Amino acid sequence: MKEAYLKHCKERKENNLPPLSLDAKQTKSVVDNLISGSDDEFFLDLLTHRIPPGVDEAAYVKAGFLTSVAKGDQFCQSISQKHATFLLGTMLGGYSINSLIDLLDIDETAETACKALSHNILIYEAHQSVLEKSTHNDYA
């Protein structure tokens, strides 16, 4: 995946174009490489900067992976629970919102999730979940 991506970047640069965002298949490959601990710095950079925020299939893969790391269900050497929560917050809404709301209930991630949600304006009807949670959760 890395070689193909670097080739793609080179071809785009020759035409004075930025590389395209990753698609769902490429994002899954990035996730698999991060899980295996292969070239963490390169793949973490791709996960952080080359997947568009929003609700496309690549964002779905990214949010699912980061949620599993943030909740402690998946181990990734290069991403802590807090950093996974932070990265979810950079997705600007969509698939990350329900995860961030759930992460308010985990001691390790509550403060980071709170900060992330406070900067997200695209939470739509999920604000009701935060309001309900605020009756018993100081971070909500």
Tell me what each language-model feature is.
Residues K2-Y5, K115-A140:
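Eukaryotic acidic, Ser/Thr-rich intrinsically disordered low-complexity regions
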Residues L17-S21, S38-D39, V55, D73-Q77:
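Charged, low-complexity interaction regions
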Residues A24-V31, P53-G72, M91-L104, L122-S134:
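Amphipathic alpha-helical scaffolding segments comprising HEAT/armadillo-like alpha-solenoid repeats
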Residues D39-P53, Y60-K62, S78:
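An N-terminal, globular interaction/scaffold subdomain
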Residues D40, Q74-S78, G94, I106-E111, ...:
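Alpha-helix N-cap/helix-start positions at coil->helix boundaries
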Residues F42-F43, S80-T85, A113-L117, A140:
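Conserved hydrophobic register position within alpha-solenoid helical repeats
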